[in-house]
Regions:
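Domain-level detector for long C-terminal conserved domains
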Residues: 1-511
């Protein structure tokens, strides 16, 4: 796409499809099935040992990913354990979405079963690519599927609805998977392409969501904020759904859909904007491909492959026990043996958001699982709030902050005087300018308001937790534009799939 490209609604001088719609607080209007098979916030190292227990920690650590989504946080955390650390690690992973649990189970079995030098690339494509090489499908069908088939055969006579557990051990590593009987049988379908699903249908099913005609203006709106050189790569992924560097040969990806995505012959399981870029730090992505900064999918490919390589190599020499559950996070205290005050880290994803279970229910239920400060002063329960500040941003705030935000925004976005004078609210440059207001917004006051409304102080006291004054896992606002940011930093953040208002809170025991 040329640098002079404009969205279709702009050149056709018409009202865009998104005009007049009731947009959600974050400004992202979703379209398609709402499965979160790929993360929508960057993966983080939940241990960050050098800033906490120390790089040479010798005691065992216990981690709980209560609403895990994909494996990004698990992989990044274990890949980051220093070689000087001699302690073991027990990792419990749960999600209430069976599609997520099934994919995570298969990926972990691949990491344990296959050699560390061959597993990363196969894991990468099963994780992110809509189409995969036929040899990857054969590899999991011939090596991983029999592991599940063996369990299904052994539990055939068990009562429907009963929980059944299986533990696989490979050297110092193990994986224990707990599912209901019928879920074990269902897991086998993730190794099979639906009968009669042709490649023509595969393309049509996916692009009916990712390139939907009724979303043309939404797509153009997103493309317009990208640097011109990035738009071609972005569209290539929208069309193909294959995670590869831009110029890489795709011949091996012509015949085989990824069965962990295509469980149905009727629809694509995710929203149109679902993108693997959202699950990793853009700064790290760009550092991976410094000579091809506009090929962000190349940078992502190299980053994920490298992280998976380090993950697979690290767990080869680590006493690590994985446990996978498929349940509501609020039921975990009843599922986990010896759970009371036993975890060094607990990650709740954004389940404490008001739109999910809320902060009170989340903390009352899961705070008792966190180690006391007397046992580990670095033990942390991590909550993420994606929507909090938008829920308390009222019309009066929108008016009151207008002048300050516009003034700061003009430092980064040049809106031509003739665009302003024309008064055309559907001008693409005017829309891009006004859409960027949240990037420069002061969210601290809004989050303070949200915490007061939800009685954070009272909840913390009730469950024996306090908010950490200094974060040692992740900054409170990791995606927010810093003061005196450069133009490059602004452009990078604006072009990301994040809403800039992601707020983390680190909780510690008061005892």
């Amino acid at each position: 796409m040329k640098a002079t490209w404009k969205p279709a609604w702009h050149t056709e001088k018409r009202q865009p499809q998104f005009a007049g719609t009731d947009r959600p607080p974050t400004g992202h209007t979703p379209f398609g099935k709402k499965k979160y098979l790929m993360a929508n916030v960057p993966a983080l190292d939940l241990l960050n040992l050098e800033q906490n227990e120390g790089a040479d920690v010798s005691h065992d650590l216990r981690l709980l990913f209560a609403a895990s989504r994909d494996l990004g946080n698990v992989v990044k955390t274990l890949a980051g354990i220093p070689t000087a650390s001699t302690g073991g690690c027990e990792v419990m992973i749960n999600d209430r979405d069976f599609d997520i649990v099934a994919r995570n189970a298969i990926l972990l079995l691949m990491a344990l079963y296959f050699e560390a030098d061959s597993a990363p690339l196969t894991m990468l494509h099963l994780w992110y690519s809509a189409l995969i090489p036929a040899q990857i499908l054969r590899a999991i069908q011939e090596n991983i599927r029999p592991l599940i088939q063996d369990v299904c055969a052994k539990i055939a006579a068990k009562r429907a609805g009963s929980f059944q557990a299986k533990k696989w051990t490979y050297g110092t590593r193990s994986l224990r998977l707990v599912l209901k009987k019928e879920e074990w049988n269902r897991l086998l379908s993730y190794f099979e392409i639906p009968d009669g699903l042709s490649m023509t249908q595969v393309h049509a099913i996916r692009t009916a969501t990712t390139l939907a005609a009724e979303r043309r203006d939404y797509l153009d709106r997103w493309l317009y904020i990208l640097p011109p050189a990035r738009r071609v790569g972005a569209m290539k992924f929208r069309v193909e759904g294959i995670l590869l560097p831009f110029g890489s040969c795709r011949r091996d990806f012509d015949t085989t859909p990824n069965p962990t995505f295509f469980q149905s012959k009727d629809s694509w399981p995710m929203v149109d904007a679902a993108d693997p870029l959202d699950g990793w730090s853009m700064a790290e992505i760009l550092r991976k491909a410094p000579l091809a900064r506009n090929d962000t999918y190349r940078g992502l490919f190299l980053l994920v492959q490298d992280t998976l390589q380090r993950f697979c190599q690290r767990i080869e020499n680590l006493q690590v026990k994985f446990q996978l559950f498929h349940d509501d996070a609020l039921a975990l205290p009843n599922m986990i043996e010896d759970g009371q005050h036993s975890f060094d880290r607990i990650k709740l994803s954004n389940m404490a958001d008001r739109g999910w279970v809320g902060p009170e229910a989340a903390l009352i239920t899961l705070a008792p699982l966190l180690k006391r400060a007397s046992d580990n002063p670095h033990a942390i329960l991590l909550t993420l709030f994606l929507n909090a500040v938008h829920e308390v941003f009222y019309d009066t705030d929108n008016i009151a902050s207008l002048h300050e935000e516009m003034s700061r925004l003009r430092s980064y976005v040049n809106l031509a005087p003739d665009v302003v004078l024309a008064g055309d609210k559907f001008n693409a440059d005017f829309i891009m300018f006004t859409d960027a207001r949240p990037v420069v917004r002061d969210f601290d006051k809004l989050f303070d308001r949200w915490m007061r409304e939800h009685r954070f102080g009272d909840i913390g006291k009730a469950v024996g937790l306090k908010m950490g004054s200094e974060h040692t896992i992740v900054p409170p606002w990791p995606m927010r534009l810093r003061q005196n940011a450069t133009q490059r930093e602004f452009d990078r953040l604006r072009a990301s799939g994040h809403v800039e208002s992601e707020r983390y809170v680190e909780w510690k025991s008061v005892e």
